[in-house]
Amino acid sequence: GEIFGEMATITHSPRSATATAKSTCRVIALDGSQFQKAIQQTPTFALMLMSIMIDRLRLTLARLTMQKALPDNVVTEERRVFDESTLDEIIAKLGNPALLRYNRGKSILKIGEAGVLMYLPREGRVTITADGRTLEHVGVGGVFGEMALVTRAPRAANAVAETDCALIAVNRTQLRQLVQSNPAFGLSLLKLVAQRLQAVTNRASK
């Protein structure tokens, strides 16, 4: 009932680990096209994979924090997940909600808080931090806060408005509806989580 090898398939990058059969086993193998088809046919599959990768990311971040080894600027480049037209489409599907506005320096999320929303910046830029370290910067087209929303676990990082910003807020029910109505949305979000996990793992190994 578990899964492995998904990282390379999602990010189209080389394998970063070795898998060895410790006993006689049978596995279901999916190539890239089959994997994409599975997500399109069963969008909630993307949420399940996201939950697995987020748990791995949380464990890695917790271990690095305990060891006082969490690197600064874990994600070195700002990742744009959605373009302008996709953001407009998301807003329309959400019923054109009012954007949440935060002034520069204002706290948006704090470690340990319940994760009832994830956010997509429509204007401005947000800084994500943990243990006094900057993990990444999220601008227009990016996403943050999805980890706690998907897994229903407490927030694992802080988020502060780096500039004045306007955010699209998405709750868990809306997230599921977006994934089910637009599999490409789920796949893009899944790829983002995979890239974050890959970035943390790569930086931790240096």
Model region roles, listed by residue range:
Residues 2-206:
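Cytosolic regulatory regions built on CNB/CRP/Popeye-like sensor folds
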